[in-house]
Amino acid sequence: MFQMAKRAFLSTTLTLGLLAGSALPFLPASAAYADPDIAVTNKQSFSTDVIYQVFTDRFLDGNPSNNPTGAAYDATCSNLKLYCGGDWQGLINKINDNYFSDLGVTALWISQPVENIFATINYSGVTNTAYHGYWARDFKKTNPYFGTMADFQNLITTAHAKGIKIIIDFAPNHTSPAMETDTSFAENGKLYDNGTLVGGYTNDTNGYFHHNGGSDFSSLENGIYKNLYDLADFNHNNATIDKYFKDAIKLWLDMGVDGIRVDAVKHIALGWQKSWMSSIYVHKPVFTFGEWFLGSAASDADNTDFANKSGMSLLDFRFNSAVRNVFRDNTSNMYALDSMINSTATDYNQVNDQVTFIDNHDMDRFKTSAVNNRRLEQALAFTLTSRGVPAIYYGTEQYLTGNGDPDNRAKMPSFSKSTTAFNVISKLAPLRKSNPAIAYGSTQQRWINNDVYVYERKFGKSVAVVAVNRNLSTPANITGLSTSLPTGSYTDVLGGVLNGNNITSSNGSVNSFTLAAGATAVWQYTAAETTPTIGHVGPVMGKPGNVVTIDGRGFGSTKGTVYFGTTAVTGAAITSWEDTQIKVTIPSVAAGNYAVKVAANGVNSNAYNHFTILTGDQVTVRFVINNASTTLGQNIYLTGNVAELGNWSTGSTAIGPAFNQVIHQYPTWYYDVSVPAGKELEFKFFKKNGSTITWEGGSNHKFTTPASGTATVTVNWQ
């Protein structure tokens, strides 16, 4: 009962403060009144967080004694291909002086912390270094130019004390640049295990790497099984490599990291990544999101499939492209922005878990000399109040510019807290913790034309309404605006920083008003929930016996019931129950997709759909079929007797289409699949052309999977 009263008091206090026009203070997650769903200890959900992506080397040099020497280092940071000296101590210093807390960010996404190559590489007469962190050599040691293991632990401890989570970049796709015929080039892609050499790219007799040439990106298969540029590409079907990465990530999880950003997931087999994610969720589950680069706003079926089946979220490139087109490049309008919001909500099972952003280290920065500051500020406001987990690239708050690599990775120019962009972020970021409509809510368009977008976020009784006019010279008359805001007057959360105004709502309608040219305004209302309402379940995949976290509002203080489908979980299987968070053990039920519900005080919550229960621990198996000839339009698919193989379905849960170009060539087909460990599988292949299915004949193929590691099973078409 105390928990419910505390929530009601906090909600009422924050709402009244906003209606009075006062600024919302930053509420550190370690504060005594913080609820568990918004706390720094919640590693399974980042719905209430704002991420700040920092290139460690480019932020701040806090310890000059660990800087490189010689040709790898430029103290002036004028040569952006060399190390500039930024390190974890620099991040610690800015955590301690409250730069991040004052900005309102509650998670730092740092460069990959592992040991990178020490060699410099000459490309076209230009010396290159591994300052970016993506040329790894040992995934179980730190990059000494960033700091020691003790420094890294200090970074995590310091961040947590300030209510800030730490996300590490992690790149299991490759080591470093290598040439098959020249072992002296760079470090030959060598991989080390805590200082012990595992192997190099040349004379790779153990098959640790792929040797299929460089990718031309012409197909998904080509991108997975060929090298990304000249980077030594791992063969994850190798049992040694599989174990190496499952062990390596546990080392960083045991250090206390709160999240993982996985590099180049488009270039690693889904079957291995799902197995890897399962091992993470068994060990220490944390929020994980991957980089699947999309070059345009167009949807990609493989991208969507990965987001819905891999067990991790993605960086939302569709969001990024739409925002840049509308606010930066002026090549699209608000209808396209609204269309993106609607289409991604349909395509992604957990759209609120996708990580939204306006720029990063792999594209031109949002800000250029030709882009008005107000457009950047509006893009930030839109991102911070939209669905998804917002990520802000370092220096954006200082209007840092730069087109392409390496200019988009320049040194942090200043740490001013007085810029308008800093002010916008600092005012809007805390809403993710104070108003569940921003963290968990649905999105509904309320008023729109080419230049104006008014949208509403809603979760239970809590509401936020956002209005943006991108036209920098013409105000907009807003009439007939409907809203879920209760009757009353509402001040702009931004306090007029972006020329927003106050509004009055009466019986679901907002009085007509003028939205100034270039204005953005945010109005919000929060209220305590008296009925259970689920906002997030994380992770979204697990085996029976794993513990998952349910976040939301109105669960009460007395244990109720959690349902996975129709299976009720009660008693000791619910390890904790608070008004905003429940921790529950996955029951022993048949594997498959389930809707999760909560029942409290005789009332059922909304359904949180698409939770995946696995059969058990996972291993990766490569399924190969010979002599499978097809006609034009046909592809080969796989199905079998477990949920991971589609439970004999020929629909969307079947595996495929299989590949036939790189590892094996037509009429041999193959596919890497995450399947239950130590289990006898029965399976068959089939040909599919639209709705026409042609099964292979004979009895079911059978194969018993290993208890760990990887395997390959090869059969002939029957």
UniProtKB/Swiss-Prot annotation:
Region (C): 441-528
Region (E): 615-718
SS bonds (residue pairs): 77-84
Gene Ontology molecular function, alphabetical: alpha-amylase activity; cyclomaltodextrin glucanotransferase activity; metal ion binding; starch binding
CDD domains reported in the protein's UniProt record: AmyAc_AmyMalt_CGTase_like, IPT_CGTD
Example of a GO biological process term: carbohydrate metabolic process
Gene Ontology CC terms, in alphabetical order: extracellular region
Region (B): 173-236
Signal peptide: 1-34
Entry's EC annotation: 2.4.1.19
Similarity annotation: Belongs to the glycosyl hydrolase 13 family.
Protein name: Cyclomaltodextrin glucanotransferase
Organism (species): Bacillus sp. (strain 6.6.3)
Lineage, opening ranks: Bacteria, Bacillati, Bacillota, Bacilli, Bacillales
Gene behind this protein: cgt
